[in-house]
Swiss-Prot record:
GO terms for biological process: generation of catalytic spliceosome for second transesterification step. This is Pre-mRNA-splicing factor ISY1. Pfam families: Isy1 (PF06246). It is found in: Cytoplasm; Nucleus. Associated with the spliceosome. GO terms for cellular component: cytoplasm; spliceosomal complex. Involved in pre-mRNA splicing. It comes from Debaryomyces hansenii (strain ATCC 36239 / CBS 767 / BCRC 21394 / JCM 1990 / NBRC 0083 / IGC 2968) (Yeast). Keywords: Cytoplasm, mRNA processing, mRNA splicing, Nucleus, Spliceosome.
Length: 298
């Protein structure tokens, strides 16, 4: 009799599940949650499965704090929590692909933002694995967490030292100006009479100390150059002109010889034709070409 009752209840349950599916009622039984999120095409159903996972995570996070649990139970619950968090992330990716909300980046825009943020940030990470509640108090886990904490403090201390060094360097740059490096040493500061003197006074002071006129003023040197050296430059130019004329005469005399000196310079003294002369030459040339083409005799 009981067997028939169970069959009737089972049939009734299947019938009720079919009716709920036809009516659009969402499934919430964790036992019927699909293993692969891609098998769900309905966005509301995917949202429902994500909500059920969040509920399971909350229950297990409370349970893992129980002081009566032994080490094996703690590790088992911690493994379940890691699997549930991975599954929740998979549903969040799938919801985004179905055109739903982006829970991974915009949790603050939803009603359960505080709860989600607390869940996602809970636990301690060690090489991609998370430890929750009493799992962080396990001997091996506690040792690794302490090493990570020391490393984090060392990195923070190093960063703080770098910031302090940068601050000191900035203060030094503000205090130490270009005059510290001797950039303005030659500018008169009112303390050095030699720097304040003009060029001739400095030369006179040097000659007075040495006893003889060792250094001549720049003006005297320039005057000497203008008076003596400039005349030499004029003589050089005159020599080059005479030399060019001689070479040109030599070239004219050797024009009829077979062996011509390739190093002889041509007449560079010849004047360059003016624009009027060039224009006249072009007109005459065009006129001659036109007469030759038409066959006109002069």
């Amino acid at each position: 009799m009981s067997r028939n009752t169970e069959k009737a209840q089972s049939s009734l349950n299947r019938f009720q599940a079919l009716k709920n599916k036809e009516a659009g009622v969402l499934e919430s039984n964790p036992n019927f949650r699909p293993k692969y999120v891609q098998s769900v095409d309905s966005l509301p159903q995917a949202e429902k499965w994500r909500s059920t996972i969040i509920g399971e995570i909350s229950v297990k996070l409370t349970k893992i704090q129980d002081p009566a649990l032994n080490e094996y139970q703690i590790r088992d619950i911690n493994d379940s929590l890691n699997k549930l968090f991975n599954e929740k992330r998979s549903w969040e990716y799938h919801i985004k692909n179905l055109g739903g909300a982006d829970y991974m980046h915009f949790n603050k825009d939803f009603n359960n933002a505080g709860k989600l943020s607390q869940l996602d940030s809970s636990g301690s990470h060690i090489k991609g694995y998370r430890y929750f509640g009493r799992a962080k108090e396990l001997p091996d886990v506690k040792e690794v967490l302490m090493l990570q904490q020391k490393k984090g403090h060392a990195n923070k201390s190093k960063h703080a030292k770098e910031l302090e060094q940068n601050r000191l360097l900035n203060e030094q740059d503000q205090r130490i100006k270009a005059d510290y490096y001797g950039v303005y040493d030659e500018i008169n500061d009112g303390n050095d009479d030699i720097i304040a003197s003009n060029e001739r006074d400095i030369i006179n002071q040097v000659n007075e100390v040495l006893g003889d006129e060792i250094i001549k003023p720049v003006d005297d040197i320039n005057e000497y150059y203008v008076a003596h050296k400039a005349q030499g430059v004029d003589n050089l130019i005159e020599f080059e002109k005479n030399r060019g004329k001689k070479l040109f005469r030599k070239f004219k005399n050797n024009q009829h010889n077979d062996e011509a000196d390739s190093n002889v310079i041509t007449n560079f003294e010849k004047e360059v034709p003016t624009s009027d002369e060039v224009t006249k030459w072009i007109v005459n040339k065009k006129r001659a070409e036109l007469i030759a083409r038409l066959g006109i005799n002069k």
